[in-house]
Regions:
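Small-residue-enriched hydrophobic alpha-helices in membranes
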Residues: 2-48, 55-163
Length: 163
């Protein structure tokens, strides 16, 4: 079952609790190792790293900080960078992401990364995003399909919440 199928299978109620998104992510990430979570955070942080603005920062925080474990990894990563000025190796990140076999997690990551580069509007980040996913075996058409199907589900969820 893909990420968008997982979303659409959730019980639809007129009012979703605020913690539902964090719980959904926590459930999705439950079987991932710390190394895999670190690779996910690194990918999203790399895409969001172009010159900061409030909208981009908010998008990155929404994607990375709703899960407590991800927040801890992100804080450790920032602290490490401040102390050492070293960044994780891109090839190591790609290799680690390649060990994630859960389709729901991969589709979540595609959608989050794509959302960041859309807000970012940075040509280099866009190129990096598509290059990384190509190395992971995803063609642009597959990315486009995941994004469109996930957006449709998010729009449906917004309509349900606003009833």
């Amino acid at each position: 079952m893909g990420f968008f199928n997982f979303f659409s299978s959730q019980k639809e109620t007129p009012k979703q609790p605020q913690s539902s998104e964090a719980q959904l992510q926590s459930d999705m990430f439950a079987n991932l190792s710390q190394t895999q979570k670190f690779a996910m955070v690194t990918m999203l942080a790399s895409l969001a790293a172009a010159p900061a603005n409030a909208e981009r920062t908010a998008m990155a925080q929404k994607m990375m900080f709703t899960d407590a474990a991800m927040m801890g990894i992100t804080q450790d990563m920032m602290l490490n960078y401040m102390l050492t000025r070293t960044k994780p190796n891109a090839q190591m990140v790609i290799s680690t992401l390649g060990t994630i076999t859960d389709t729901e997690v991969l589709e979540w990551l595609i959608y989050c990364g794509y959302s960041i580069i859309v807000v970012n509007q940075n040509e280099k980040a866009c190129s990096v995003f598509f290059d990384w996913w190509h190395k992971l075996g995803y063609e642009p058409e597959e990315i486009d399909r995941v994004v469109k199907e996930t957006e449709a589900i998010c729009n449906k969820m917004r309509q349900i919440i606003n009833l």
